[in-house]
Design a protein with these regions (language model features):
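Conserved ABC ATPase signature
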Residues: 75-79, 83
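Catalytic Walker B motif of ABC-type/P-loop ATPase nucleotide-binding domains
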Residues: 100-103
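A short, proline-enriched helix->beta-strand linker immediately N-terminal to the Walker B motif
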Residues: 94-98
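Conserved ABC ATPase "signature" region
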Residues: 8, 56-71
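ABC-type ATPase nucleotide-binding domains, specifically the catalytic core motifs of the NBD
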Residues: 38, 42-56, 65
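Hydrophobic anchor residue at the start of the ABC signature
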Residues: 89
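Helix N-cap at the start of a conserved alpha-helix in ABC-type nucleotide-binding domains
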Residues: 111-113
């Protein structure tokens, strides 16, 4: 069986898995995924709309902590790669997930934004009692985590 947040998801239908993931799992993909015709704000609103049972975070506050609050009304193609990566992190965190999966969350980020992103991910995990799993090749992250698994 596969248990996440005390729920066995191994027998869920595809629809149930989609709903569960939207409510409980925040995913930071290595390459950001957005609906390109929507602004960052609209992408965040859509994520909140698709998971109405969950308490959502404040989009502007999350974007501010990622230093991209001023990009709120821009479309993804108007952002730099680093800004897209940070907006992708906001998208993963907007529904206050119980599990945060971050695949190369600091790719395309400078040192300053790398530190901010890791602090935000760890704070979000602590504040919402969420599990945080980070997959990375980025040596800058090693100092931020006590538990490391090197393969």
């Amino acid at each position: 069986s596969i248990n996440i947040s005390g729920t066995d998801i191994s027998k869920f239908s595809d629809t149930e898995l989609d709903k569960f993931r939207g409510d409980n799992i925040g995913i930071v993909f290595q390459k950001p995924h957005f609906i390109s015709s929507l602004t960052i704000n609209e992408n965040l609103k859509l994520a909140k709309y698709l998971s109405p049972s969950k308490t959502s975070g404040d989009a502007k506050k999350i974007l501010e902590s990622l230093n991209i609050k001023d990009k709120y009304q821009q479309k993804p193609n108007q952002l730099s790669e680093g800004e897209k990566q940070r907006a992708s992190i906001a998208l993963a965190l907007i529904n206050s997930p119980n599990l945060i999966l971050a695949d190369e969350p600091t790719s395309s980020l400078d040192d300053f934004n790398c530190d901010n992103v890791i602090k935000l991910l760890k704070k979000q995990a602590k504040d919402h009692k969420a599990q945080l799993i980070v997959i990375t090749h980025d040596a800058r992250l090693k100092k931020h985590f006590k538990n490391n698994l090197n393969l």
